[in-house]
């Protein structure tokens, strides 16, 4: 923020979530067309030409829509990894996840059960997670002030060598699988 004191205040998740909440609330109530336009009509009356009054109302509506468009409303997850066959692939044993969370309710984000770095003024988060060999279903949760889940998303990340041949059909003969290499069951497997 341009104002250091305001920046320090907004860096507190409990303050930032209330800021986002009230910003949205004001846009939905006081600055809604239903409430603001009668106020403009009452205050301006016949003092300004109708075109100027309409311009004021149009400006207020556009400003309101812009403000609402700046408020993150959904939990998003980005991996920065290449995607193949429906999975993200990582050669590394760690992956960095990032995204946004619902700004008006979120005070913390967890990635795979661990606290993510939460940048409250932007409703943005980032986390480094450890991957096991094979398919990792990573759970990201946005939490409110009481620790309740607000939203959740999954990211499926494959770590290590991809299976040479996805399994998923009828087994017609004996098969021996070991933990030395990950297996991917892509279709129903009939034994």
Please provide the spans of the model-predicted regions.
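Middle-to-C-terminal accessory/interaction subdomains
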Residues: 1-94, 99, 170-171
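Low-complexity, disordered linker/stalk regions enriched in Pro/Thr/Ser/Gly
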Residues: 58-191
């Amino acid at each position: 923020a341009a104002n250091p004191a305001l920046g320090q205040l907004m860096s507190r998740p409990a303050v930032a979530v209330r800021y986002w909440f009230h910003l949205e609330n004001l846009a939905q109530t006081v600055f809604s067309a239903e409430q603001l336009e009668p106020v403009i009509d009452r205050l301006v009356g016949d003092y300004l030409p109708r075109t100027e009054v309409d311009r004021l109302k149009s400006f207020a509506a556009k400003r309101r829509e812009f403000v609402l468009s700046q408020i993150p409303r959904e939990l998003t997850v980005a991996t920065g990894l290449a995607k193949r066959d429906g999975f993200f692939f990582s050669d590394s044993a760690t992956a960095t996840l990032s995204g946004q969370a619902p700004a008006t309710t979120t005070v913390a984000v967890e990635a795979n059960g661990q606290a993510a770095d939460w940048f409250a003024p932007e409703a943005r988060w980032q986390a480094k997670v450890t991957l096991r060999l094979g398919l990792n279903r990573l759970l990201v949760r946005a939490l409110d002030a009481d620790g309740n889940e607000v939203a959740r998303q999954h990211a499926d990340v494959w770590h290590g060598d991809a299976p040479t041949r996805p399994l998923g059909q009828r087994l017609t003969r004996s098969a021996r699988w070991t933990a030395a290499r990950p297996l991917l069951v892509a279709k129903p497997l009939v034994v």
